[in-house]
Amino acid sequence: MKFTNLTAKEFGAFTDSMPYSHFTQTVGHYELKLAEGYETHLVGIKNNNNEVIAACLLTAVPVMKVFKYFYSNRGPVIDYENQELVHFFFNELSKYVKKHRCLYLHIDPYLPYQYLNHDGEITGNAGNDWFFDKMSNLGFEHTGFHKGFDPVLQIRYHSVLDLKDKTADDIIKNMDGLRKRNTKKVKKNGVKVRYLSEEELPIFRSFMEDTSESKAFADRDDKFYYNRLKYYKDRVLVPLAYINFDEYIKELNEERDILNKDLNKALKDIEKRPENKKAHNKRDNLQQQLDANEQKIEEGKRLQEEHGNELPISAGFFFINPFEVVYYAGGTSNAFRHFAGSYAVQWEMINYALNHGIDRYNFYGVSGKFTEDAEDAGVVKFKKGYNAEIIEYVGDFIKPINKPVYAAYTALKKVKDRIF
């Protein structure tokens, strides 16, 4: 085995072939970091047949003018079951970054620690407890099992839906009642989905603005999304849910005809048997449905006059690789939230994964707090409704490469933090 630099082609071919390969360990992310002006390294291990068996994208940032801070975002991509390979990789990686004036090395591997349900109850161990001892022996310090959303650290909890050996019907069957109803609702109510181009990205950004204002969370800036759409190319998809009013109103009219037919039947039953309470209840229920149907038709016609035949209502931002589809961000028009457009977006992308043989649908980050007053309690409930599970990752590890200078650096940083 040998530790070596990799070409972008070698790196991409290997990371695309591996499980637990995060979108930040892809050629698209490498090209993005180059364009942003970061010092970037592609490194890995090749076996005696010159085949890549481990890979890692590193970025380096200047620290204290002379030194550099090296970071591998969700790397390396490696067979973690091969502990000998893991030891060799991190040992050689430390030597490599030391040659490049590294002050300290930071990694947050895409490696599960344990599994939980959406109530925060542990359902299983991932079998990677050995990794903590291994990293400690190699000189890495674990930063702890942090919860919540941090501006610097990667989120430690993901909500993930397993699609392996499942059909679309299986997915719907396993949803809770609300998710099931809304998914079926958007399928029949004229809600369509198409993919936005770069020129149309402001539509998505406007929805994100609506959502961030209503739910009080900090969104990324425009540059973040535009750059990833540009450099990730077909590894980013931005599905837009919209109402086609011609189809929507047509379907409502067809529904009205059926309801009127059923109502007339109920009225005839009452004429025949006036004492039949069941027929009276059925009549009342059908009349309520007809009233609601008429309101929807009137609303549809009004909105069609105001907005034209197509009305954008929701959009999402997704990362794609052979391992998983990642729901990174999404927003919905507050004015048209009742059309449940976000469910159309989710259903489109779940089916995208199924149709492309991708076994994992990642709803992405949750805080890991699992309380009613958690900042993401509503989001957790939404993701739970799809019958997803929580994966908790091992977290962050830091290795001081130049120990004396790193000790001085951290001491100085603590003083600054106290002052400011």
Curated annotation (Swiss-Prot):
Give the PROSITE patterns listed for this entry.
FEMABX
Reaction catalyzed = beta-D-GlcNAc-(1->4)-Mur2Ac(oyl-L-Ala-D-isoglutaminyl-L-Lys-(N(6)-Gly)-D-Ala-D-Ala)-di-trans,octa-cis-undecaprenyl diphosphate + 2 glycyl-tRNA(Gly) = MurNAc-L-Ala-D-isoglutaminyl-L-Lys-(N(6)-tri-Gly)-D-Ala-D-Ala-diphospho-di-trans,octa-cis-undecaprenyl-GlcNAc + 2 tRNA(Gly) + 2 H(+)
Q: What is its EC number?
A: 2.3.2.17
> What class does this enzyme belong to in the EC scheme?
transferase
State the InterPro entries in the record: Acyl_CoA_acyltransferase, FEMABX, PG_Glycine_Bridge_Synth, tRNA-bd_arm
Sorted alphabetically, the Gene Ontology cellular component annotations on this record are: cytoplasm
- Where located? Cytoplasm
SUPFAM superfamilies found in the cross-reference section: Acyl-CoA N-acyltransferases (Nat), tRNA-binding arm
Q: Which UniProt keywords apply?
A: Acyltransferase, Antibiotic resistance, Cell shape, Cell wall biogenesis/degradation, Cytoplasm, Peptidoglycan synthesis, Transferase
Q: Which domain of life is it from?
A: Bacteria
The UniProt GO MF terms for this protein read: aminoacyltransferase activity; nucleotide binding
Stretches assigned to coiled coil: none
State the Gene Ontology BP annotations. Answer: cell wall organization; peptidoglycan biosynthetic process; regulation of cell shape; response to antibiotic
Main localization (coarse): cytoplasm
Q: Which cysteines are joined by disulfide bonds?
A: none
The record, for PANTHER family, names:
AMINOACYLTRANSFERASE FEMA (PTHR36174:SF2), LIPID II:GLYCINE GLYCYLTRANSFERASE (PTHR36174)
The free-text function statement in the UniProt record for this protein reads: Catalyzes the formation of the pentaglycine interpeptide bridge, which is characteristic of the S.aureus peptidoglycan. Adds glycines 2 and 3 of the pentaglycine bridge, using glycyl-tRNA(Gly) as donor. Involved in resistance to methicillin.
Q: Please give the subunit comment from the record.
A: Homodimer. Interacts with FemB.
Q: Which family does it belong to?
A: Belongs to the FemABX family.
State the name under which the record lists this protein.
Aminoacyltransferase FemA
